[in-house]
Design a protein with these regions (language model features):
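PRPP-associated nucleotide enzymes
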Residues: 1-181
Length: 181
């Protein structure tokens, strides 16, 4: 059985993702020209977007990676506590940080992470997400760069998973409810 059989419908095609990443890369390149840009990928979900975005950015930049988890709630909710599982390797002092995310959902994790990163004395901290789900927002946080707004459905592909599967789908699709019910 193919992974595609578990998908109810495709929300964002592979072609649309490629075009949007190129557009975001061009915008980021213009906005950060002459600055000390660091792309910070929040793993694991943003790995596919990060790989594509960094190649679409036409100016010199550094990359770094973090693994964070929200905990204290059930597996579908969060209490807003953020634990850093893997911290950045580099120093952020004087750098312009762009957090690269797969999806901005409730915003709770990023609303805690952004102030933590700002304590490291960067010039700036901004957010770039390929998917935004504003209907689920619980924290007062918005992306500075956004790919696509998506409805409140269970989306997978292009780095997003269910039970560590589907990340390698080249598009963003809605998972059939019977798969995760």
């Amino acid at each position: 059985m193919s992974m595609n059989d578990d998908i109810k419908n495709i929300l964002v095609s592979e072609e649309a993702l490629k075009a949007k990443v190129a557009e975001l890369g061009a915008q980021i390149s213009r906005d950060y020209e002459g600055r000390n840009l660091v792309l910070v990928s929040i793993l694991k979900g943003s790995v596919v977007f990060m790989a594509d975005l960094m190649r679409a950015v036409a100016i010199p930049c550094n990359i770094d990676f973090m693994v964070v988890s929200s905990y204290g709630g059930s597996n579908t909710t969060t209490s807003g506590l953020v634990k850093i599982i893997k911290d950045l390797d580099g120093d952020l002092s004087g750098k312009d940080v762009l957090i690269v995310e797969d999806i901005l959902d409730t915003g709770v994790t990023l609303s805690k992470l952004v102030p933590m990163l700002k304590m490291r004395n960067p010039n700036s901290v901004k957010i770039c997400t390929i998917l935004d789900k504003p209907s689920r927002r619980k924290a007062d946080i918005q992306p500075d760069y956004e790919g696509f707004q998506v409805p409140d459905e269970f989306v997978v592909g292009y780095g997003l998973d269910y039970d560590e599967k589907y990340r390698n789908l080249p598009y963003v699709g809605v998972l059939k409810p019977e798969i995760y019910a």
